Amino acid sequence: MKSSFSTVSSYSDHKFAVKDAPTTIRDSLRLTNAVEDPGYMTLSLISENKVDDLMFNSKMFQDHMVNDFRPKFSHADSSEIMITLNNLKNDILSTKNIRELESTDLRSEVAKQFAARRAELVSHLNASLRPLIDEVFSMEQRLKAFDAENADFVGKTKQYKSTFRSEVHSRIRAGQSKLDALRHGLQTEINSLEAIIEREFAQAANRLNQEVSNFKESFDASERNIKLQKKHVISGMNEKIKSFAESVAKYLPILKKNSEERRFNQMMMQKNLAEIMTVLSDNSEHFGDYCFSDLVPDTRIFDAIMTTKVD
């Protein structure tokens, strides 16, 4: 069996694990076989503070420990095991004190190194940040100056705005007054023009009505004169046609007796008839279409004249 309980450093590589709170010595300190090598033992402690309270006696060991170490300690007696465990306890306490001392010295050294490093970093930061701090301070001064200029500009702007608003309102009121006066004068002119236009329109309407009335009277008089003239012309033409018909009726027997004379008279009658027809045709616009209806009873004379053959 390999044993490494003789030196303090031999326990630095052992594993310590925290488990449930100890209730017995067996629970407080348990030695188990190592997995890698059965010849070594691994020590598991619940708490280092419990080491001072460990009390060992042969009966406790016999009740709680012997069965766990069989057959490793089958030939060892109780006193040797107790001595070994006490040595282990002392070694653990010594290791604890040494570690506390080493931890104190290390803490002091680390504090010194930290202070030195801190001073170095502060110095480096001061050297690096000084231009930036100066620039920030300069920018702050310029910002204050800009704020002052901005405040002055804002004050002047407000004053200018107030003055401008007053001036604009004054001009608007003056313009409104002029506009009202112009609107009043324009309305007066419009009313005057409307009155003149209405008066002129009424006069023109009266003159137009008078002219229309005069024209109507003149047209009616002209129409009456035309009808009267038509009547006279038609009456005269009827008289002439009647006289011509009587002459034709008078000369028809003579035409039958003397062909030469009849031929001459027939030509003369045809000539006279042609002249009458020409006169009637030229004056048809004055007589109208109905003037020939008044000649219907005597048309047989014209037919006799126009159809009579000259031998």
Curated annotation (Swiss-Prot):
<feature type="coiled-coil region">
    <location>
        <begin position="185"/>
        <end position="233"/>
    </location>
</feature>
<dbReference type="GO" id="GO:0097597">
    <property type="term" value="C:ventral disc"/>
</dbReference>
<dbReference type="GO" id="GO:0005737">
    <property type="term" value="C:cytoplasm"/>
</dbReference>
<keyword id="KW-0206">Cytoskeleton</keyword>
<keyword id="KW-0175">Coiled coil</keyword>
<dbReference type="GO" id="GO:0005874">
    <property type="term" value="C:microtubule"/>
</dbReference>
<keyword id="KW-0493">Microtubule</keyword>
<keyword id="KW-0963">Cytoplasm</keyword>
<dbReference type="GO" id="GO:0000226">
    <property type="term" value="P:microtubule cytoskeleton organization"/>
</dbReference>
<comment type="subunit">
    <text>Interacts with EB1.</text>
</comment>
<comment type="function">
    <text>Giardins are involved in parasite attachment to the intestinal mucosa and in the cytoskeletal disassembly and reassembly that marks the transition from infectious trophozoite to transmissible cyst. They may interact with other cytoskeletal proteins such as microtubules in the microribbons or crossbridges, to maintain the integrity of the ventral disk. Involved in formation of the ventral disk.</text>
</comment>
<dbReference type="GO" id="GO:0000278">
    <property type="term" value="P:mitotic cell cycle"/>
</dbReference>
<dbReference type="GO" id="GO:0097568">
    <property type="term" value="C:median body"/>
</dbReference>
<dbReference type="GO" id="GO:0005200">
    <property type="term" value="F:structural constituent of cytoskeleton"/>
</dbReference>
<dbReference type="GO" id="GO:0097594">
    <property type="term" value="C:ventral disc dorsal microribbon"/>
</dbReference>
<protein>
    <recommendedName>
        <fullName>Giardin subunit gamma</fullName>
    </recommendedName>
</protein>
